[in-house]
């Protein structure tokens, strides 16, 4: 049974609070929306802390961004949300936030495009980086246009991240995965570099999506994520017998 508009408003309140509690937004950062139907979108207002919203704070606007109802002004970045909905009819919710580590990668001009974690390869493929665009203007959306149809989560140059999904909780969980992936990626760099999965394993993971009921095509035809072979990495693999032989030779050399 479809949710009521009131229930959707409460969903945005709940997700906004979780985003704020996790430290993915500061002050009035971030915005959230849910597509109510073909003609209307429910979105967060501008200039409000996402951890302190109430259901009645939300704005209903049309697919051109014009306010239909609400006592506050809509988010200034509604165009980004509408662009996602126009390019992806399967999407019902969009979440934009500034998770610190993922945003650090975006500010450094770095995408999260390596095949490091099975869960990320299966669920997101990878998280590409879109060029910087001035917030609150069409310049913000333009760099996203070629990427939105291909991926489920994007980094935004010097800005943050945007995730979208079939509902607001799916968008939230994708944002959580992006930040988790960014933190692990950073740790691998601090430890001297990542051991990237080989192409054969990436292919197996992408094929496993059907088994898990995951419908995204990210990573299947767009050159992302990058496997070990594409980075010139060779995975060092030896058998148990070879290890024993190497240890024996090393011990003999010390005599």
Where on the chain are the PLM-derived regions?
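Glycine-rich flexible loops
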Residues: 1-255
């Amino acid at each position: 049974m479809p949710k009521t508009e009131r229930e959707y408003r409460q969903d945005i309140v709940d997700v906004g609070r979780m985003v704020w509690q996790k430290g993915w937004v500061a002050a009035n950062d971030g915005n959230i929306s849910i597509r109510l139907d073909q003609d209307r979108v429910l979105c967060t207002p501008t200039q409000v802390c996402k951890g302190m919203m109430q259901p009645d704070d939300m704005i209903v606007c049309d697919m051109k961004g014009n306010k239909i109802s609400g006592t506050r002004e809509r988010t200034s970045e509604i165009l980004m949300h509408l662009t996602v909905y126009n390019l992806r009819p399967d999407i019902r919710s969009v979440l934009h936030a500034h998770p610190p580590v993922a945003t650090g990668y975006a500010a450094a001009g770095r995408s999260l495009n390596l095949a490091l974690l099975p869960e990320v390869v299966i669920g997101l493929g990878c998280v590409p980086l879109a060029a910087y665009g001035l917030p609150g203007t069409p310049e913000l959306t333009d760099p996203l246009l070629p990427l939105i149809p291909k991926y489920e989560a994007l980094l935004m140059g010097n800005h943050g991240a945007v995730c979208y999904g079939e509902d607001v909780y799916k968008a939230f969980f994708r944002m959580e995965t992006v930040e988790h992936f960014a933190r692990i990626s950073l740790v691998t760099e601090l430890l001297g570099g990542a051991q990237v999965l080989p192409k054969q394993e990436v292919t197996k993971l992408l094929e496993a999506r059907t088994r898990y009921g995951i419908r995204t095509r990210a990573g299947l035809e767009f050159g992302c994520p990058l496997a070990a072979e594409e980075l010139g990495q060779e995975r060092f693999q030896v058998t148990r017998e070879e290890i024993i032989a190497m240890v024996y030779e090393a011990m003999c050399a010390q005599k």
